[in-house]
Amino acid sequence: MNKMSHSEEFAAGEMNAIRASVWQLLSSLYAKELSRERICELAGAELWQAFAAQVELQASASQIQAALAHAAKYDASQGGDDARLELAADFCSAFLQNAEHCAAPYASLYLGDAGKTERNETASYDTESQDKAARSLYGEKHQLMSDYLRSAGLGLDADFREPSDHLAVILGLMAHLCTSATEESQRAFLESAILSWLPEFNARLGKLKLESPLYGALGDFTLAWARLDTELLGG
């Protein structure tokens, strides 16, 4: 293999930093509800327009920007907090309800035994199944991500009280790998830890009846970005 020139190394490093920033942004959007300041910051960001220039991201990026701009403009014009509270309610409905009724953002619920229960197309979801899903949140996938974090010298914020297989944690770890791991390692993690369950998660998210299109579009964007990043890594 030919050694890269300094200019090629710089370009690769710059691209990896950009990729890392996208993954980190997505991680933050799944981690907690948006504050008024964060809504205004993201609504005015030019990055959504930049994303919209990429055909795979165009539709979802435009929807995200429009939803954020609407929320920021509405609250500013009304001098209130109604749009922010609506988005907070959507966040709760999308990610914080019982796993039967939301798109629970935990890898454990889509992979392994719990995932098999979750993928059942029938409407039944008995107490035993719920207990099994609850136990799995701190089971194998949680432990696997905890091990990943430790090996990378990372940890969770004290105020983030979620299992390590939460989507926000996994996306944050992907951001870290963009600038610290080989392309082969990044692609392997992306395929095994993210794309192995993200399509099913996004399908569930898309079926929810939410007030704003923000989180549905966020799910579409996340999946499209994950697939695009796999291509960037030569997958």
Swiss-Prot record:
Keywords: Chaperone, Cytoplasm. The keyword Chaperone applies. SUPFAM superfamilies: TorD-like (SSF89155). One of its GO terms (cellular component) is cytoplasm. It is found in: Cytoplasm. One of its GO terms (biological process) is protein complex oligomerization. It comes from the Bacteria. It holds the Pfam family Nitrate_red_del. Belongs to the TorD/DmsD family. TorD subfamily. NCBIfam families: PRK04976.1 (NF003442). This is Chaperone protein TorD. It comes from Shewanella amazonensis (strain ATCC BAA-1098 / SB2B).
